[in-house]
Amino acid sequence: REEKIPLFFAEEAAKRDWKHFGMIPEDTKYNQSHATIYEQDEAVGHSVRAVYMYTAMADLAATEHDEKLFDACERLWNNMTEKKMYITGGIGSTVEGEAFTKEYELPNDMAYAETCASIGLVFFAKQMLKMSKNGKYADAMERELYNGIISGMQLDGKRFFYVNPLEVNPGVSGEIFGYKHVIPERPGWYACACCPPNLVRMVTSLGRYAWDEDDDVIYSHLFIGQEARLKKADIKVVSEYPWKGHVSYSITPKTGDEFAVAIHIPGYLKSFEVTLNGMRLKENGETNADVIYSCLLYTSDAADEL
């Protein structure tokens, strides 16, 4: 046995004479146990299992300040979002094992793109933001929330999609072998009902994904209307996003300590402007797809309108 394989899984399988890792016996890629976490550089196997594990990896990297582990997370992130993700943010392109397949193999009409996988990608993105305030992670959260996740629930909250295809063909989707998982209409429930409660959990906990706060900076990741009670300030956000581009922040500092507010500017914007109490601070700012947080320094005890 090679020294670098994840020994726990191999040893337990030998003890139990049990070799089922997924759809195929000995398919260790199904549950991402084919290599150590430091050596993985391609998103493989069951997509939900994958992003949940990557979330734990990123959390551990941030907690332990483990740059090597963060580098592994970054490699997996880049492979998944640049080569294995639909334009909607959907991941996991095949029903076979609910899994990732080959790079750029993203069929519209046979897509799996499980709702739980998109939710898991938001979990992963939020943990990556702990280590690096790179705008691409917040961009991914936004893409999922407005596309890959919200499609999983009907507007009245009573019917759900487990699978989120980009193309549905009446008479083919849900009927013909290879397309039976692509259901044309949202069912009321599922025998394996992981997605509906997971989606509800996401919607009811959006606040934790919208903000981060460290010693001297408050980070706003998402343009979600809300009232946030943070350590340094109370912030009310009134948002017309995504229908209109206007978002206002009413910021009431709680202490006289100096702090900054850093607002994520989506990487796809061609331009933006920032005003403070009606005074223009930035006009026609250009965005960078990799890193863009517009920062404003606060020293006042008075409330401000941004």
Regions found by a protein language model. Name each.
Residues 1-297:
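Glycan-recognition and catalytic cores of secretory/periplasmic carbohydrate-active enzymes
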